[in-house]
């Protein structure tokens, strides 16, 4: 009898990707976050679709339509809070996924890594445009401040800003186009995820040792499907805990006030997952310099394969690099905290020092540490 799973044109693709996929036998729970990101994307697309059925992309009715969803639509409050907090869960998983990639040297698979960086930019753009849609105070002023940064581009900057706005300020045209892009981008992200997986399955997964594990790979199912189901269950548990008990914990109270172009909030800030980049932007007094630093703070990930100096792939047996890695993580937490603080005296200098150390660790200290560790290992082996 023909094995349908292995011979059917469609099922064969699923089989090679999720069932008979040869997988390293020693990958840890840090490898769970790829599948968790898939769950997050499905949640976001599903809840977003239902929200789009009731939302109106018009400056006069956008805020009241969100209010209507929460008050009058059956389980509208649940769908809205799942979508809003789903973005936070998405970014938590995303940051851990990237952090694991840096720690274990997954960036050596350059095609997979570069598609991942493009995905990060696409997810950040989607989240930013989604934050504008409820048309609260922070939505309006966040959109105004962040889009206005493009005016720092020489010659063409102001024209680009007006072109994005569809006028001379953030208005109805801006909201309509942001809604259109916010709706279409998740489907583009889903397509890019397939490309990401395609490149990953060309090379096979990395593992904690950073060594080739072709000799002893095991099938993905049942070993890692069970592991992914456990991870997915835990994610949904903590996600629903957040949604049902602390739905506004990660939001901004200013966004419960309808947008008013005549009244600026005392402290304009983006969502928590952009605060580290926002802190880097604010730490440079020059507008163009700040924008370049903002873009580079994420684009720097593209250069990781080029500045990898060690003969070892993973940081598992590299204590100096490990120490620098955890300092970098602490540094990012400090930047996130600084981004949420008002522009005042201790915070400015802390932000500037954290920004300098962020770029220094990645571009200078980690490559030097890789060379030193190789020299130490060579010296030790010669003893």
UniProtKB/Swiss-Prot annotation:
Main location: mitochondrion
Keywords tagged on the record: Electron transport, Heme, Iron, Membrane, Metal-binding, Mitochondrion, Mitochondrion inner membrane, Respiratory chain, Transmembrane, Transmembrane helix, Transport, Ubiquinone
Binding-site positions, heme b b566: 97, 196
MF (Gene Ontology): metal ion binding; ubiquinol-cytochrome-c reductase activity
Domain of life: Eukaryota
Transmembrane segments: 33-53, 77-98, 113-133, 178-198, 226-246, 288-308, 320-340, 347-367
PROSITE patterns per record: CYTB_CTER, CYTB_NTER
Membrane topology, from the record: Multi-pass membrane protein
Subcellular location: Mitochondrion inner membrane
Keyword Mitochondrion included in the entry's annotation: yes
Pfam families per UniProt: Cytochrom_B_C, Cytochrome_B
GO biological process: mitochondrial electron transport, ubiquinol to cytochrome c
InterPro entries the record matches: Cyt_b/b6_C, Cyt_b/b6_C_sf, Cyt_b/b6_N, Cytb/b6-like_sf, Cytochrome_b, Cytochrome_b_C_euk/bac, Cytochrome_b_N_euk/bac, Di-haem_cyt_TM
GO CC annotations, alphabetized: mitochondrial inner membrane; respiratory chain complex III
General function of this protein: Component of the ubiquinol-cytochrome c reductase complex (complex III or cytochrome b-c1 complex) that is part of the mitochondrial respiratory chain. The b-c1 complex mediates electron transfer from ubiquinol to cytochrome c. Contributes to the generation of a proton gradient across the mitochondrial membrane that is then used for ATP synthesis.
Quaternary structure (record): The cytochrome bc1 complex contains 11 subunits: 3 respiratory subunits (MT-CYB, CYC1 and UQCRFS1), 2 core proteins (UQCRC1 and UQCRC2) and 6 low-molecular weight proteins (UQCRH/QCR6, UQCRB/QCR7, UQCRQ/QCR8, UQCR10/QCR9, UQCR11/QCR10 and a cleavage product of UQCRFS1). This cytochrome bc1 complex then forms a dimer.
UniProt family annotation: Belongs to the cytochrome b family.
Name of the protein this chain belongs to: Cytochrome b
Organism: Psammomys vexillaris
Gene that specifies this protein: MT-CYB
